[in-house]
Regions:
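Active-site-adjacent loop/helix micro-motif of nuclease/hydrolase catalytic cores
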Residues: 72, 83-94
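Active-site metal-binding core of divalent-cation-utilizing nuclease and nuclease-like domains
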Residues: 36-70
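Conserved catalytic cores of phosphodiester-cleaving nucleases, focusing on short active-site segments
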Residues: 61-63, 74-82
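C-terminal tail/extension regions appended to the core domain(s) of diverse proteins
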Residues: 1-12, 18-34, 85, 89, ...
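Residue-level detector of short, conserved catalytic/binding motifs and their immediate flanks
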Residues: 57-59, 74, 111-112
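Conserved beta-strand segments of the P-loop GTPase G domain that flank and frequently precede/overlap
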Residues: 77, 114-118
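Conserved N-terminal substructure of TIR/SEFIR domains
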Residues: 18, 70-72
Length: 182
């Protein structure tokens, strides 16, 4: 997947290409054995007692364990970063806040955010998002870092984890993955 070709691509199109690539890895006979135990879903409707049919929220990407027994799910919401796509979208009600407010359910206290970087650097967005999380702790229900951002100036991918409290008072570990597409 040549990342530069996605510099102005819509969020759903990038997500589609990522999910296709992950599914190709799963079907490759040379893939590691752990790949057999997980399924990846795109735009998967979430089940709620008070929402049904088309009114159910849809998770951009969801990983599900497919072995017998409990089937934990790890959902990711994706947001573009760059130009008119700001950190407000990433952290706001259709991004991080959707997990914190219970709009998106979690099965085991973990969820993720994907940042599709289409302008500026991974370092720029990491610093911006980190500062906004710590400067507005109450708004983002930010508690602490599990894994702090470790910046490498030439990085095209960056991962960090943050700890939050949901509106219901449960601890939530957020996995942040920033991917450069320019």
């Amino acid at each position: 997947m040549p990342s530069a070709s996605f510099a102005s691509t819509e969020e759903d199109d990038i997500t589609d290409h990522l999910v296709r690539a992950m599914r190709e890895v799963k079907t490759d006979p040379e893939s590691p054995g752990w790949a057999d135990f997980y399924e990846v879903h795109e735009q998967r409707p979430q089940n709620f007692a008070d929402k049904s049919g088309k009114r159910r929220p849809k998770m951009d990407i969801e990983f599900e364990r497919n072995a017998r027994g409990p089937r934990p799910r790890l959902g990711f919401e994706a947001k573009r970063l760059g130009g008119r796509h700001t950190s407000n979208g990433y952290l706001g009600e259709e991004g991080l806040a959707a997990f914190l407010e219970g709009y998106y359910p979690t099965s085991h206290g973990e969820a993720g955010m994907l940042g599709y970087i289409q302008a500026n650097s991974v370092q720029f967005w990491s610093e911006k998002l980190s500062a906004e999380l710590t400067d507005a702790r109450e708004r983002h229900r930010f508690v602490d870092w599990y894994v702090r951002p470790r910046i490498q100036p030439t990085a095209r991918i960056l991962h960090f984890d943050s700890q939050h409290m949901t509106q219901a008072g449960a601890s939530l570990r957020m996995i942040h993955l920033l991917l450069s597409f320019h």
